[in-house]
C-alpha cells in the first residue's frame, strides 16, 4: 500500500511553501532577545514558552529568576515578553513612564464590551474611568459599606459553625467562596444573597459562570498563538465571558437604572448606585460621566476581580494560621484584647490592628493572587541602556519576587514579623506588590483588605483552626493563572465557646 499521497508537483510545491510560511510565522519573533543578548528559555515554534506554564506561571518564573538573573526574555506565542526584577526598572515602568509608555495591559483575549472596564480599558478612556471610580473606593465610602460587610461576616460564622458542629474536618473553599460572592454581589449591586444556602439564586449561578475558563484551553491558546484571532473573535461577538451571564447582568443594570430614575427614596449604598449617581448633567454633557455600558462593565469586573481574591486568600490565611499555632494564638490575643466579648469592630479600629495587618500582609507575600504584573509598551523605550520597540510586553514576576531570598530571609517561611512597624520600613514597595503599584494599581485594594480583615476577626473571635490528616502539608499551589491551592483546603475547626454574637 502506498503511504505517500499521489499529489501533483504543483501541490507538493504549494504544500512545502505553506509549511515554510507556517514555520516562519511560528518563529519569526523568536530571535528578538537573542539579538539583544538577553538570556531566556528556548521557545517552541508557534507556542513560544506557554507550555511551560503547565506547572504554574509562578513556578516557571521562579526557575527563570534563578537561572537567568535580573532580566530575561520569553515568548507567549509570537509575543516577546521582557521580564524585569530590579526595583528601579519596575518603578520606571509602573510609575515614571506609566502615562507615556506603559499605560495599558495587554489585550490578549476577546472580551466584548468588558473592554470598557477599568481593568481592561486603555489610555485616555482608562484615565477617565479610573477618575470617575476612585471616589467610590475612599475610606469614607467604605465606611458607609461597612455595615453590609459586617452582616456577611456573621453569615460566614453561622455557615462555618453549622459545618463544624458535624464533628468532621471542614472544606473551607465553599464557605469562603460564598462569603466572597455574597459581599461582592451586595456591594456591587445592592442585592442580598446567601449563596452557600441558595446556590440556584440567579445572581449566584450567573456570577459563578464568569470564572469557568481555563487559560490553557484551546480557545485561549489560539489567541496566544495567533493574536490576530482576537480581533476576529471580537467581530464575531465571541467572548471569554459567557453570553447568558452578561445578558442577565445587562438586564439587571438597566432595570436598576429605571428604578433609580423613578424613585426618590434613598437606596442602600452600593457601587452600582454610586456610579448611577455620578451620571450628572454636567459630566454627561462634557462626556466625562460613565456611560451605561461602562457602568455595566465595572459592575461585572468587580465580581470577576473580587470573588477569587477573597476566597483563595482567606483559605491561605487559615492554612498558615492552622500550621503556625503560635501565630494564631497571638492573633487571637490581639483580637480578644482589642474587641472584648466578641465586640464588633469599627472600620478604624480594625484598620489599626497591627498584628492582624502583619498576618494579612505576610499571607499576601506568600500567596499573591496575581502571579505577574504586565504592561504593554505603546512606544519605543529603553531599559538598562537597551532599546526596545513598541509592542514589547514588560512583565514583573511578582510571585517570584515575593519568594526571592535576596529580599526575604527564608522566603518560603510564614513570618508575620517581616511586616512589623520596625521591619516594614525596609520593605521595598517595588518588590512587595500584592496589589500592583503606580497609577494603575488595584483600585479595590482597600475594599479587599477590609473584607479579609473583617472575616478574620469574626472567624477568630469564634473558632480555632487546626490541621488534620486531610490537610495538604506543605500547601501545593495550582497551575491556574489566579493563584489558589491545588486542592480544596480542609481543616479541623473548633468553636472557642458556645456564644456567637449576632450569628
From Swiss-Prot:
Residue sites binding heme per the record: 442
EC id: 1.14.14.1
Cell location: Endoplasmic reticulum membrane; Microsome membrane
InterPro entries attached to this UniProt entry: Cyt_P450, Cyt_P450_CS, Cyt_P450_E_CYP3A, Cyt_P450_E_grp-II, Cyt_P450_sf, Cytochrome_P450_3A
Membrane topology recorded in Swiss-Prot or TrEMBL: Peripheral membrane protein
Cofactor(s) essential for the protein: heme
GO molecular function, one term: heme binding
Protein name: Cytochrome P450 3A15
Described purpose of this protein according to its UniProt entry: Cytochromes P450 are a group of heme-thiolate monooxygenases. In liver microsomes, this enzyme is involved in an NADPH-dependent electron transport pathway. It oxidizes a variety of structurally unrelated compounds, including steroids, fatty acids, and xenobiotics.
Induction info: P450 can be induced to high levels in liver and other tissues by various foreign compounds, including drugs, pesticides, and carcinogens.
Family recorded in the similarity comment: Belongs to the cytochrome P450 family.
Recorded name of the encoding gene: CYP3A15
Alphabetical list of CDD domains matching this protein: CYP3A (cd20650)
Keywords tagged on the record: Endoplasmic reticulum, Heme, Iron, Membrane, Metal-binding, Microsome, Monooxygenase, Oxidoreductase
A Pfam match: p450
Catalytic reaction equation(s): an organic molecule + reduced [NADPH--hemoprotein reductase] + O2 = an alcohol + oxidized [NADPH--hemoprotein reductase] + H2O + H(+)
Any Gene Ontology biological process: oxidative demethylation
GO cellular component: endoplasmic reticulum membrane
Keyword Iron annotated: yes
The UniProt record lists the keyword Transcription: no
Amino acid at each position: 500500500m502506498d503511504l505517500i499521497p499521489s499529489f501533483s508537483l504543483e501541490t507538493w510545491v504549494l504544500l512545502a511553501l505553506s509549511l515554510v510560511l507556517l514555520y516562519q510565522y511560528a518563529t519569526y519573533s523568536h530571535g528578538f532577545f537573542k539579538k539583544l543578548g538577553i538570556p531566556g528559555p528556548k521557545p517552541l515554534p508557534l507556542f513560544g514558552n506557554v507550555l511551560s506554564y503547565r506547572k504554574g506561571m509562578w513556578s516557571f518564573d521562579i526557575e527563570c529568576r534563578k537561572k537567568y538573573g535580573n532580566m530575561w526574555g520569553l515568548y507567549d506565542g509570537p509575543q516577546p515578553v521582557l521580564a524585569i526584577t530590579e526595583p528601579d526598572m519596575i518603578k520606571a515602568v509602573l510609575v515614571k513612564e506609566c502615562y507615556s509608555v506603559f499605560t495599558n495591559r495587554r489585550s490578549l483575549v476577546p472580551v466584548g464590551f468588558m473592554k470598557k472596564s477599568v481593568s481592561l480599558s486603555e489610555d485616555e478612556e482608562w484615565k477617565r474611568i479610573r477618575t470617575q471610580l476612585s471616589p467610590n473606593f475612599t475610606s469614607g465610602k467604605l465606611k458607609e459599606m461597612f455595615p453590609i460587610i459586617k452582616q456577611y461576616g456573621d453569615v460566614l460564622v453561622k455557615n462555618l459553625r453549622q459545618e463544624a458542629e458535624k464533628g468532621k474536618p471542614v472544606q473551607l473553599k465553599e464557605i469562603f467562596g460564598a462569603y466572597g460572592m455574597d459581599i461582592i454581589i451586595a456591594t456591587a449591586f445592592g442585592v442580598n444573597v446567601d449563596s452557600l444556602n441558595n446556590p440556584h439564586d440567579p445572581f449566584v449561578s450567573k456570577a459563578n459562570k464568569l470564572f469557568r475558563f481555563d487559560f490553557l484551553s484551546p480557545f485561549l491558546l489560539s489567541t496566544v498563538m495567533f493574536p490576530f484571532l482576537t480581533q476576529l473573535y471580537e467581530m464575531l461577538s465571541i467572548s471569554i465571558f459567557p453570553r447568558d451571564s452578561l445578558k442577565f447582568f445587562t438586564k439587571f443594570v438597566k432595570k436598576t437604572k429605571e428604578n433609580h430614575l423613578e424613585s426618590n427614596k434613598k437606596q442602600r449604598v452600593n457601587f452600582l448606585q454610586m456610579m448611577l449617581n455620578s451620571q450628572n448633567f454636567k459630566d454627561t454633557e462634557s462626556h466625562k460621566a460613565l456611560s451605561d455600558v461602562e457602568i455595566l462593565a465595572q459592575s461585572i469586573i468587580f465580581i470577576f476581580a473580587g470573588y477569587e481574591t477573597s476566597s483563595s486568600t482567606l483559605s491561605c490565611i487559615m492554612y498558615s494560621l492552622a500550621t503556625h499555632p503560635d501565630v494564631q494564638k497571638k492573633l487571637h490575643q490581639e483580637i480578644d484584647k482589642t474587641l472584648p466579648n466578641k465586640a464588633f469592630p469599627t472600620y478604624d479600629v480594625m484598620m489599626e490592628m497591627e498584628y492582624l495587618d502583619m498576618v494579612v500582609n505576610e499571607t499576601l507575600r506568600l500567596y499573591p493572587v496575581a502571579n505577574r504584573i504586565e504592561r504593554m509598551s505603546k512606544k519605543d523605550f529603553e531599559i538598562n541602556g537597551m532599546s526596545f520597540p513598541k509592542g514589547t510586553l514588560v512583565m514583573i514576576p511578582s510571585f517570584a519576587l515575593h519568594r526571592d531570598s535576596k529580599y526575604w530571609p527564608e522566603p518560603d517561611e510564614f513570618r508575620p514579623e517581616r511586616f512589623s512597624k520596625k521591619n516594614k520600613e525596609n520593605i521595598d514597595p517595588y518588590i512587595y506588590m500584592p496589589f500592583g503599584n503606580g497609577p494603575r494599581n488595584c483600585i479595590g485594594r482597600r475594599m479587599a483588605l477590609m473584607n479579609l480583615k473583617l472575616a478574620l476577626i469574626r472567624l477568630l473571635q469564634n473558632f480555632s483552626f487546626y490541621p488534620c490528616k486531610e490537610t495538604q502539608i506543605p500547601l501545593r499551589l495550582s497551575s491556574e493563572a489566579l493563584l489558589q491551592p491545588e486542592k480544596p483546603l480542609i481543616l479541623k475547626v473548633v468553636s472557642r465557646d458556645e456564644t456567637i454574637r449576632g450569628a
